[in-house]
């Protein structure tokens, strides 16, 4: 399975900050925002990833991330010429995907406290689409998934006025190879975009959409506004200062996934020692702990 990391958009809700820098390059505590979703993909065992950006910001992302080889990854880059919707990512990445399954993650989403590997492995082996559900206070601001007592998906709607469930769909999606043709069949919405919710609805109509609910201990932060960004900073800082854990550390995720050996991790730590980030990486190599983080199991799966 290959990954797509969508880091396009104009960041209009964060202006004037985003006049000068991409939203996904803004710092969230001690690292760029893009590190957090990238680390999630890497922690799932995905090492071939296409980063989709705007044309004006492509060089900045390439300067930050390089080709990924320093982390044992293979990163490629592509441009979304205008805001064409999340689902357009599958058309942009068609050649990169090479007819295989895909994990798509939005570059402004932070997910923590969940082991997604079982779901990713299942998606590698089975046909269909897979989304996640997180209970939120105001689901009307998000895509919302509804399901019955048996766990079957009944509906999925984008920002409904009257939500049919409290479960929002975060920006992490798993699909089989059919997603490219599904996206190609869509018509632009009223705002001129190919909507990810319509992709999910197409899978639902075929009886091929499943959902996994993220339970207690799972954290989802969508950094769409400045207030959201500050909440993300507060959360990352609290975990760092309280538990000594750096969320969204790509180097650590790659090491734990087996993409880097310990000597390579130490080498990455050296030029970062003055910031404290390097000291954290160096400490990992001698902590005597298992490389595999122990996250709570996903609480419910439906299909």
UniProtKB/Swiss-Prot annotation:
Catalyzes the formation of dTDP-glucose, from dTTP and glucose 1-phosphate, as well as its pyrophosphorolysis. It is an enzyme of class 2 (transferase). CDD domains: G1P_TT_short (cd02538). The keyword Hydrolase does not apply. Belongs to the glucose-1-phosphate thymidylyltransferase family. It comes from Actinoplanes sp. (strain ATCC 31044 / CBS 674.73 / SE50/110). Its cofactor is Mg(2+). Pfam families: NTP_transferase. SUPFAM superfamilies: Nucleotide-diphospho-sugar transferases. GO terms for molecular function: glucose-1-phosphate thymidylyltransferase activity; metal ion binding. This is Glucose-1-phosphate thymidylyltransferase. Keywords: Magnesium, Metal-binding, Nucleotidyltransferase, Transferase. Disulfide bonds: none annotated. Binds 1 Mg(2+) ion per subunit.
